[in-house]
Amino acid sequence: MAGGYAIDAFAGAGRREHEDIDIGVFAADQLAVQAHLSGWELHAADPPGTLRPWREGETLPPAVHDIWVRRDHGDSWRFQLMLNPKGPGEFVCRRDERIRMPFGDAIWWRDGVPYLAPEVQLFFKAKAPRAKDKQDFADCLPLLSAAQRGFLREALELVHPGHPWLGAL
């Protein structure tokens, strides 16, 4: 689980409304996920910002990161799958592969559900922060450990030097 629900699991449920459910999957597992969702309507953001049907058995190119899922054409989107690369035993950031961490540190568990670590999710939100992303950062900041703050600070300095969140970290 990723996105706002991952932040809620860390900072407290019910802090704000959510528009969708974000689920991270490894790009290498995309065809298995597609088979599991047989009967659902799947659309790839290809090119980004444009949705097109994801054809059965089609391996999406590395530039495609998002898949939108709904039951059928008349239904609203139920959730978004986010494709991510994976290194051997490590999380590899799809936005910048220099950003890596042991896989066990990139995921945390609550009530049997795996969630993207808050420092990683906040890094993704930092690219073009909306009001809700700024709120997520403010809600998480006092709860982040020194190691989590350090990861987020280093990732932001590397990819978004001068980011406004750096001063708070």
Model-derived regions, located:
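Compositionally biased terminal segments of proteins
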Residues: 1-169
